[in-house]
Amino acid sequence: MIASLNFPALHASHSAIWFAHPGKPAVRISKGEAIARAAETPLIMLNAPLIAQRLGYPELSGLDLLELFAFVHPAQFMVPTPMGLVRALKLELPLPFRGGGNAPELALQSPLPTLSPKGERAEQGLPESSIPALLHAAAEALIATLERPDWPQREGAWTGLQALARLRWPWAGVASRHLKAPEKAERWLFSRLPEWEEQPPRPQPRQITLAENDAEAQLEALTGAGAERREGQRQFARTAAHIFAPREKRAEPHMLLAEAGTGIGKTLGYLAPASLWSHAAGGTVWISTYTKALQRQLSRETERIYADEAEFRKRVVIRKGRENYLCLLNLEDALQGGFQNRAAVLAQLVARWAAYSRDGDMIGGDLPGWLTTLFRRAGVTALTDRRGECVYAGCPHYRKCFIEHAARSSQNADLVIANHALVMVNAARAREQQGRPTRIIFDEGHHLHDAADSMFAVALTGQETVEMRRWVMGPEGKSRGRRRGLAARLSDVASYDELGGRAIEAARIAAEALPGEGWLARIREGAPSGEIEQLLAAIRGTVYARDESGAEDAGYGLETELAELDGPLIAAAMEAARAIHALHQPLVALGRRLEILIEDPPDWLDGPARARIEGAIASLGWRIDLLAAWASLLGRIGGPADPDFVDWLALDRVEGREYDM
């Protein structure tokens, strides 16, 4: 036994609570005893928040093996259960203690057989009384790994552990005794990550026509010689092959709307001609799905096409929206004080993961899904780019960005597995001109309308306007973090260019009309501030007035059509439109000025400043378009209807609590 691990272990299930000192048999205790012992000394446990929930004691803390596993084995899959821990660490399975006296025996089995990742079968038959001993064995195995010279995740561990020790991470004291300082100073995380390289544009694909027989032969190669012959699948592949034929007229691509019943095997039915065409023509085929589950299935299916792993990673790229990937600039801010207390511990563990992650995908990638559940406030959303704040080339980590890595990999891939939302975003914002898809297969096509509606629809809401204010003005009051306003992001322009500086200042003044912190409380109290809050208050009153369900206290959102509106609401909409226009004008002027500075650069415009301006132009254009859409929407309140749009008023609620309108 490792002397520094002389801590008791605790396991709580729905049926019992088991407690054990190292080398001692487990004893069954009550909830009150468990809480008292947790207050006396740190306890080794697995999934502390879950144990706290079962004990009914939310303040429970201790030595959580999941956190230690995330530190020792970052980016490694592990089911967060006792048996999942056994399998991940290749432990021998402890059976119940037997014998008596002061020296009980611990019977061990041989290593477990390989099971499915979920490990349901392995959980059966494991006595709960043996789990505390299992937790002790797992803790010893993890701590012993820190001393192994062949530990593959050693780099960065010492630096990370010192930071965690300053944060009083419960495991820091034990781990520090077993992790030696490196002989040479460790490299900073952001200097260790690989950079992507600019690649020449992929040549235009060759114009070829796929023969039906070739598509069928490719299907047979993918399904294997012993597979069942399904005529429906073969017909699907033969028909799908025709959409890859050369165009006959400009702007009229070949299209096919195909439906296949359950059991036809449509996935391989379209993968066969798609992979055949991409290989023969030297082009890229995008396969768009609606769900992450189908993305994962497609990734597994395409492994049949490229048996070699290196070739597979080169030829097949999975693309997701920006909000799925770790933003390195957000992570740097979190590591340098943007996160506090337990959130700061999460940031350090995410940094450990980032150094070894395959692609930086935080949602459905190799970041353990259970890691973020160990921390009360969800910090993951703050580590991704969910607000469109990316400054692109103006970011100091641009060359190492996970999102840019994926974008450039997809430009030379044969198959890109994306989702409807990303395809719609690229279609709407048209940022990735070089890698824009020219051949697209929409699987789960019945969801395509929802994805398009989500992207191309516009919503003038309290939360959206708050985000716009923050984007222009930056953090206000006690707000922390790297979020900066226009003046800070474009400090060079604000300082050295008179016209640009005026536009930035005018935008800042105009943005004060948008809702700020506490807007929802002010509206509820009947004291809205500014033109937009006045409009939102009028909308709220109208929605409640027209609700005929009598369910004002129900937990569901409320809606009403935008028709037969009263005078005060129309007047509030006109005032709000003027406020939106007042912000739109200086942003348009700023956009024009930035383009002039790029075309005719002044002496002060060095490389970094140019990169910041180019990044700002992209995000500025998006905000200008959004403001114009808001103005158009407000113009239809009390004005003529537009047959191309369906407009309505809504109050968003969850469990009876209003959160937007």
Name the predicted role of every residue range:
Residues 84-94, 98, 125-179:
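Acidic, Mg2+-coordinating catalytic module of metal-dependent nucleases/exonucleases
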